[in-house]
């Protein structure tokens, strides 16, 4: 058995005295593992850092075998990732989520979002939005997707402002207003792809929304808690948004 595909490195663990077991995410083959001979050498250590983009060739005698990897560097993101704490935390969170999916099960859209994330990891505002979208898609891949297409109560397509915590379906402003304290807020960037998050409240509402359904459908059934890295990441995003807002205010004052 053999395949060759571009991949994003997720992590490694020691295998014998000189080798490692490498874990990557690919578009067509999903999360995959294999042995890299000599992977503990200094030269290979640079290549095998999480976040690096490689051309991966995997082969084994039988499909069920662990197999071997041969790698070629395409884009070594890891050296720059350390400059952006939000990106490091976000990658750790994405890897945490991916570990909840079956190995060798393709999830091309999740791969595409991860790839886009790695292309823009130095843009924290873009990454915050991408991570919310990743968690939304992750829920869908597990069969717990939210229905944000129309109001669950009226069928309306406009002014969708809430999500029912019971059904996971959108609710319009008119129908949801009397029950707004019991509903989850729906940020507009999840409804309209042309809309970008206005401020941190949009991002925070996005994480609250995905976190609620992740807890119900994914974490609690597996007896696991919300990952601490997710909590830290949301706090980092909030700090970054506040710094940006202060910078914008200062520029406005200087023009007066």
From Swiss-Prot:
One of its GO terms (cellular component) is bacterial nucleoid. Keywords: DNA damage, DNA recombination, DNA repair. The keyword Cell inner membrane does not apply. The keyword DNA repair applies. InterPro entries: ARFGAP/RecO (IPR037278), DNA_rep/recomb_RecO_N (IPR022572), NA-bd_OB-fold (IPR012340), RecO (IPR003717), RecO_C (IPR042242). One of its GO terms (biological process) is double-strand break repair. Disulfide bonds: none annotated. Belongs to the RecO family. Involved in DNA repair and RecF pathway recombination. HAMAP family: RecO (MF_00201). This is DNA repair protein RecO.
